[in-house]
Amino acid sequence: MQISVESLSSVKKKINFEIPAARVASEVEKVYDEIRKHAAIKGFRKGKVPKDIIKKHYHEKMADDVLKNIVNDTYFKALTDEKIYPVSYPVIDSDELKVGENFKYSATVEVFPDVEVKDYDGLEVKKEKFVLNDEVVTGRLREMQENMAHLEPAEAGVAAKSGDYVTFDFKGSIDGVPFDGGAADDFQLELGSGRFIPGFEDQLVGMKSGDESEIKVTFPENYGQKDLAGKDASFTVKIKEIKVKELPELNDDFAKDFGEFETLEDLKKKIAEVHNLQENERIEADLRDRLIKALIEKNSFEVPETLVDKQLNLMLENSKRRLAMQRLTIEMMGLNDEGYKAQFRSAAETQVKGSILLDALARKESIEVTAAEVDEKLEQIAQQNNQDLEQVNKFYQQNAQAKENLSAQLKEDKAIELLLSKATVTEVERKELDK
């Protein structure tokens, strides 16, 4: 067997194979014997079918099986011998398989880039300056009031306003023709929530229970359903019920409803404490992102599309999961799967490059994660999620991939700490961050 390797790029290799005719003939015989054991052809006993009859009835299967067996036997051996570590499935391109002739095929794969990280001393980055903001406490209290609010039917004759919940029937059409997803009964919508097509909710404001009206809107050009994007639509709407939100009064009794507080002042202090913690975490995460981007600017290299696609799919699923918790979809955001991927592909590529560089830095600086550090992190996870440590340990013991991911994250964190220790960090106001 002859093997040659072509480097199509820094992250793509093509492995060329030439299999001797004798090997092909041997594999054909093996496949023939295997098929003959099970072949059921009228007029012949199982296992006694002549070779020419087998070839006539099972020609395509024989060719497929021979190709599969040869590729499986030779491809993986070549990866080991040539020290190639693919991150993608191979794309196989082959000649026609002919008995008595050498067989040629190629396998093209993406590979992990060989990166030597450089210029990571003295990276210059900006960090957002933490600022205390009393308005946050007021806003959070308002959110808590909203969450504790209950809905009451509006008085007869009262017009709907922003913030009210309206239950209505609607039927949509484009040029008089109904379209999929354009109709519903007893649909409830909070006016001002932005869940509907731009302009739709605004036209419900001022309507009263029992009112019927025609609403005209234009679907956004980037709407998720491409067949509707940019088109004018008409909706007939009938208001069935209007409900208004009744907010609880902000006082000590309100605070006591949340269990651990005796006074409203205690609740405010806790809100401020949690906010400050979250703000600092956000600022540190932003600093981390800026540090990684600064490192990427110093280290130019290609990344396999397979890794970017994998990261994009992960981001998409996470976004869908978060939106689902709010009873939303990416289509409601004016996107579909392909639109999302196009919009966030650059961000996914940055994340992949960052992970590769941090891994390279960890190797170069001999950064390792100890068992004690893993145990400490598991304790933090248990505390943060109010879980029993024994259960957390058991989960990671039974999920090798989860534990490997945890160790990899800890190693990345230590690499970031090293970068920070060598970086020049300047604190600035938020508005100065991107100047």
Swiss-Prot record:
Q: Where is the PPIase FKBP-type domain?
A: 163-248
Source organism, top-level taxon = Bacteria
Quote the Pfam families the UniProt record gives. FKBP_C, Trigger_C, Trigger_N
User: Catalysed reaction per UniProt?
Assistant: [protein]-peptidylproline (omega=180) = [protein]-peptidylproline (omega=0)
> Is Cytoplasm given among the entry's keywords?
yes
Task: Please quote what the entry notes about the protein's domains.
Answer: Consists of 3 domains; the N-terminus binds the ribosome, the middle domain has PPIase activity, while the C-terminus has intrinsic chaperone activity on its own.
Q: What is this protein called?
A: Trigger factor
Report the source organism. Geotalea daltonii (strain DSM 22248 / JCM 15807 / FRC-32) (Geobacter daltonii)
In the record, what lineage is assigned to the organism producing the protein?
Answer: Bacteria, Pseudomonadati, Thermodesulfobacteriota, Desulfuromonadia, Geobacterales
